[in-house]
């Protein structure tokens, strides 16, 4: 029967959320956040995994793992991070986004290209 073959094709995920979408909003911009998977750590903190992207009109950030705090509108990553803006490229070992996305600290081994 085809049922056994179909059962083998089903992928079981440990994620609480598949393809989560969030936004950080401040007075001047919105930063949209997407990922492939997410897990609730508590009421406000969500662990975002796999292909995590932050996108605004001014910049984008890509990494693999982020802890996003919905209440405080903050994000933190300890994985390889790629930042891109019109005249700036930054590669770092992680970042800390706070003040509703107005401030971003990049840390670890960082490589900056200014055009």
Model-derived regions, located:
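Mature-chain termini and adjacent capping regions
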Residues: 1-115
